[in-house]
Structures are given as structure tokens and as C-alpha cells.
Amino acid sequence: MSATKTLEAVARDRVGKGAARAVRRQGQIPAVIYGGNQAPEAIAVDLIRTRTLIYAGGFKTTLFDITVGGKKTRAIPRDYQLDPVSGVPLHVDFLRVVSGQTVTVDVPVHFVNDEKAPGIKQKGGTLNVALHTVSLDVAPDQIPDAIEVDLTGREIGDVIHASDLRLPAGTYTGEPTDTVANILPPTVLGAEVEAEEAAIAEAQSAEAAEEKAEAEAEATNEKNDTEE
């Protein structure tokens, strides 16, 4: 898993929309640390640092040592809100990490060695990904950075199930038979593309015919009006 990262924060003595806006005007983001059988702690974290961490990826699967007034708390991000227009972070929720605790996280699935898969490299097949992430219920300090799937030797028609993945034992929240990915023959996607292109062409042709008919009708009406 990723190394634990550090994050400096300051305590907030006021909460609510007005207080949150004041925090944001100071270049910070309102946040809260909760859980662990302790009272929630309202904090503020640096906007630029936090935005960088969020957009770097893996934010919600990374452990943080958050320092507030000299006191260090280990926590993991559970949620964050972004401005729908600007994408600027508006708020972050951190969960305290305590001994014996597990958390449910979505871990990305990375596919490697596609150039060593005969079904893709030599036969023109396409990797069809059903699950881009897998949900794991795991101890915070055991969260994988990603789940790697080796495509070496894979042929057209091969199906990769959750049971084929190398996961921490007993952590997957789904079913072993869940399809993660499969390799489709080139004709499957080709037929879909051809059908889609044909449908688009038919729609464009119908639209053009309709516009032509409307133009002819308008021209006829104008001619009749002139003759009258």
C-alpha cells in the first residue's frame, strides 16, 4: 500500500455555512475527523495541498497523519465534496483509524502486459473491462494501491473473474464469480460500430429528406402566393 502521508491542519472553533465560507476565503478547506468512539473534530486544511492530493488519485485509499495543534491523528479520507463548476474542493471527511478496524474502499484495477496477450496482440481482440475498481473490506494499513491483472497468454473468449485476482484473503465484498473483464473478438465490436454508423447515416438521410421536402413545400407556397 501507499506510504502514510502527512497533513497539517488547524482546529476550527466555529462550524456552519458562514464559518465554512470564512475558512475558504483564507485559502483553506473545512474538514472533519470523526469515528473511533471520539467526538468529531472540526479542522481546516490547506486548499492547494489538499486539491493536489485529491487530483493525484488514490486519495480515499491513502492513510494520513493529520497534525492539529501538535497532536497527531491517523485517519483515512471517506468523502469529499467538489464545487460542481470549478472543481475546487469544498469539504473533506476523515475517519479516525483505530486498532482492529476495517474500512470498505474501492481499489482500482490495473491491467498489464496486454502486448503479451495473443488474443489482443495477434488476433485483434479487445479487452472489455467490466470492473474498473473492486470493493474491499480491509484494514486501513493493508489497503492495496491497485489490483494488478496480468494479461499474459490471454486469448479471445477468456473471462477474468474476481476469483482470479490476487486479493487480501476474505476482503472482497462481491462474489467470486463476478466478471472483471473479458476479451472480445474483433467482429463483435466491429459489428456494433457498423450498426451504430448505419443508424446515424439513416437518421441523417431521413433528416435531409425532411428538410428538402420542407424547402420544396415552402418554395411552392411562395410561388402560389406570387401568382395570386
UniProtKB/Swiss-Prot annotation:
UniProt record similarity statement: Belongs to the bacterial ribosomal protein bL25 family. CTC subfamily.
Basic and acidic residues bias locations: 209-228
InterPro entries the UniProt entry points to: Rbsml_bL25/Gln-tRNA_synth_N, Ribosomal_bL25/Gln-tRNA_synth, Ribosomal_bL25_b-dom, Ribosomal_bL25_C, Ribosomal_bL25_long, Ribosomal_L25_dom, Ribosomal_uL5_bac-type
Record key words, sorted: Ribonucleoprotein, Ribosomal protein, RNA-binding, rRNA-binding
Annotated segments matching region Disordered: 198-228
Protein purpose: This is one of the proteins that binds to the 5S RNA in the ribosome where it forms part of the central protuberance.
Top-rank taxon: Bacteria
A Pfam family this chain is assigned to: Ribosomal_TL5_C
Assembly notes: Part of the 50S ribosomal subunit; part of the 5S rRNA/L5/L18/L25 subcomplex. Contacts the 5S rRNA. Binds to the 5S rRNA independently of L5 and L18.
Gene: rplY
GO cellular component: cytosolic large ribosomal subunit
Keyword Ribonucleoprotein: yes
CDD domains the UniProt entry points to: Ribosomal_L25_TL5_CTC
One example GO MF annotation: 5S rRNA binding
GO biological process, alphabetically ordered: translation
Protein name: Large ribosomal subunit protein bL25
UniProt keyword annotation of Ribosomal protein present: yes
